[in-house]
Amino acid sequence: TVTVAMKADAIHPGFGFLSENARFAELCKKCNITFIGPSAEIIHKMGNKSEARKTMMEAGVPVVPGTKEPVYTVERGMELAKEIGFPVMIKASSGGGGKGMRVSFSEEDFEMNFKTAQQESIKGFSDDTMYIEKYIEQPKHVEFQIMADKYGNVIHLGERDCSIQRRHQKVLEESPCIAISEELREKMGETAVRAAKAVGYENAGTIEFLLDKHKNFYFMEMNTRIQVEHP
């Protein structure tokens, strides 16, 4: 490749799909080229949302009530949705950009929504693995920017309110978030740092939370890269 031919020491993957490609990060390592980002192992662990949920639960980080295992079939999904309690959010484990997500409000619409979300996941991410969460009504989408070095030091750079969305994609970001108190801001920031430390994270990343109307917050996912809107 050009990178090898030019004897580059490092490569920055930008903010697209390549930046979250664990295989590419591993290839850089094999070629003795520094991948400016987290390790392939962390990209894989946090990029798979089912695995990320499990990791955060083990670290004591609050997550949205939901499945602890991957879901592949409508039948198993229905069983788990009944246990969680409707309404539920059906999500693709490898999803992103609002793809592979559907809300199911009852048993009657569950099968249709599950199949639609799973087909989107297969088409967009070549993965049929799903998971199910309790649907948080009237939520706020609040995310924290974190930075981490290779020595285990992690800081956060404050929060953004990303609640104004269209088709599960952010339209507007506000900072600081006026919906949280200074005390809650500190608590959420500390949790974001703890989440990053739990996986030995390095480089820039984003910890995303859902905040319910009672001011309870839950880990939703982690972006293992700089955000596309913050190049």
Model-flagged regions — what are they?
Residues 1-207, 211-230:
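N-terminal beta-alpha lobe that positions the nucleotide/phosphoryl donor
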